[in-house]
């Protein structure tokens, strides 16, 4: 009887630990999703504005509307700097998505472990 009780305690602890980990990961996923969605929306808005500004800059350059080469170079450098910051934000978002996907895989792995634990307790599964 003591072996059965010890076995039950061990399995019960593992179930609870898996559930605790799943809850932590699920909460983290919800937070990450909100952050990613917000970052992507802002990035897309900023990219749209940036692309419009680049298009306007190129149009002014083709029409020779800059008062000097220095004015052209200053505005071009400012646009390049903004483009580089946008590229960095894109890389940050990609890293956030990668972390999110890794957490999804951890949650799926916990689900598979929980299923194996359930199957090991199901006497009919052991016979199959």
Regions flagged by a language model, labelled:
Residues 1-22, 26, 72-128:
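C-terminal amphipathic alpha-helix
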Residues 32-33, 63, 82, 110:
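Feature targets compositionally biased, intrinsically disordered low-complexity regions
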Residues 28, 35-78:
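Extended alpha-helical coiled-coil "stalk/arm" regions
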């Amino acid at each position: 009887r003591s072996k059965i009780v010890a076995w039950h305690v061990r399995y019960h602890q593992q179930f609870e630990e898996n559930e605790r980990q799943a809850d932590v990961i699920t909460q983290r996923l919800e937070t990450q999703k909100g952050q990613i969605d917000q970052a992507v929306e802002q990035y897309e808005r900023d990219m749209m504005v940036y692309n419009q500004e680049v298009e306007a800059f190129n149009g002014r350059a083709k029409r020779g509307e800059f008062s000097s080469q220095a004015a052209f170079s200053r505005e071009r450098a400012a646009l390049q700097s903004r483009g580089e910051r946008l590229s960095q934000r894109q890389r940050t978002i990609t890293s956030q998505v990668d972390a999110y996907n890794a957490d999804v895989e951890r949650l799926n792995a916990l689900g598979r472990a929980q299923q194996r634990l359930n199957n090991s307790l199901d006497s009919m599964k052991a016979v199959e």
